[in-house]
Amino acid sequence: MAKRDYYEVLGVERGSSEADLKKAYRRLAMKHHPDRNPDDKASEELFKEANEAYEVLSDASKRAAYDQYGHAGVDPSMGGGGGFGGGAGGANFSDIFGDVFSDFFGGGRAGGGGGRGGAQRGSDLRYTLELNLEEAVRGTNVNIRVPTLVNCKPCDGSGAKKGSSPVTCPTCGGIGQVRMQQGFFSVQQTCPRCHGHGKIISDPCDSCHGEGRVEESKTLSVKVPPGVDTGDRIRLSGEGEAGTQGGPTGDLYVVINVREHAIFQRDGKHLFCEVPISFTDAALGGELEVPTLDGRVKLKIPEGTQTGKQFRLRGKGVAPVRGGGAGDLMCRVAVETPVNLSKRQRELLEEFRTSLENDESHSPKASGWFEGVKRFFGDL
């Protein structure tokens, strides 16, 4: 099968710059690399094709020969340039595109810091703190126990036995990176001996085995301000994992999770609750006590109250953590139908029902609904 035009393979114009070629190649290689597409022969062939095209077009002399003579100008069997060394196994995926991924993800683990080698910031930690609604609304002080990594005391975080110190890595010369030739690529990789630190420990500390850090659980006091809600974060600066090679300590983020309440539901600064009332109180009106976070308050129920009616108790909600006035407590009435009636109670209700017959003024919604039903069926 005839080879495709190399510019077509990369999806660029013939006059494209070296930067455009590189950008197009990386996009294709990231998409079709075998590490991303295992057992996908089609992607493997596209990756090889992109490698071949980029090797030629990224080399000024090969590109000139290709532009003048086409594939014949770079085909060794026809007296052209050298062969292709990339192939599907050419360069390591993570090494070729490490700088691309650094742009996407900021490099390394979330909360880490610094470049390769040398001092690196410790990772940030996350701790989920469960609170009940009252604690979240009023604020509280809580002691938490957090597992973390701290500097090893015997070696003071160096990883080397007392009396010794880390030495410059002979493999990378202290840079933390080595340059390797893989196919037609020359790529920079993390030094396999010092793992990017630039130094090695020839006599490791017995306590941390050369790591410079050890696991430890810390007890911390967390001051929770009033008004927090699920998802709010409290940052404890410097309470994360210890850094390496003398790097700064990370932070601890305490993430709030407020448990469900038996009575109240929260929406921002407002609270909601359902208040059951008897149908006699709903019909005749009355006064009842309802709970709030500050204690019980009296709520006046007017006569003729229907299920779903909502009453607002101003200022009985939550004062937001970021300031502002307290929200309201919204009490939604739910009229209960009586059950387990005595004989006398049933008789009274029967009398009451009889007294309502043919008098629609007592149930305006019901009468209106029935009228609507009649019109509906009359239109069919």
Curated annotation (Swiss-Prot):
Domain named J: residues: 5-70
Positions that bind Zn(2+) 2: 169, 172, 191, 194
InterPro entries: DnaJ (IPR012724), DnaJ_C (IPR002939), DnaJ_domain (IPR001623), DnaJ_domain_CS (IPR018253), HSP40/DnaJ_pept-bd (IPR008971), HSP_DnaJ_Cys-rich_dom (IPR001305), HSP_DnaJ_Cys-rich_dom_sf (IPR036410), J_dom_sf (IPR036869)
UniProt entry keywords in alphabetical sequence: Chaperone, Cytoplasm, DNA replication, Metal-binding, Repeat, Stress response, Zinc, Zinc-finger
Required cofactor(s): Zn(2+)
Subcellular location: Cytoplasm
Cofactor stoichiometry and binding remark: Binds 2 Zn(2+) ions per monomer.
MF terms in GO: ATP binding; heat shock protein binding; unfolded protein binding; zinc ion binding
Region of interest: Disordered: 224-245
CR-type zinc finger span: 139-217
GO CC field: cytoplasm
Job description of the protein: Participates actively in the response to hyperosmotic and heat shock by preventing the aggregation of stress-denatured proteins and by disaggregating proteins, also in an autonomous, DnaK-independent fashion. Unfolded proteins bind initially to DnaJ; upon interaction with the DnaJ-bound protein, DnaK hydrolyzes its bound ATP, resulting in the formation of a stable complex. GrpE releases ADP from DnaK; ATP binding to DnaK triggers the release of the substrate protein, thus completing the reaction cycle.
Record's comment describing the protein's domains: The J domain is necessary and sufficient to stimulate DnaK ATPase activity. Zinc center 1 plays an important role in the autonomous, DnaK-independent chaperone activity of DnaJ. Zinc center 2 is essential for interaction with DnaK and for DnaJ activity.
Subunit-level organization: Homodimer.
Name of this chain's protein: Chaperone protein DnaJ
Native source species: Pseudomonas syringae pv. syringae (strain B728a)
Lineage per the UniProt record: Bacteria, Pseudomonadati, Pseudomonadota, Gammaproteobacteria, Pseudomonadales
Record gene name: dnaJ
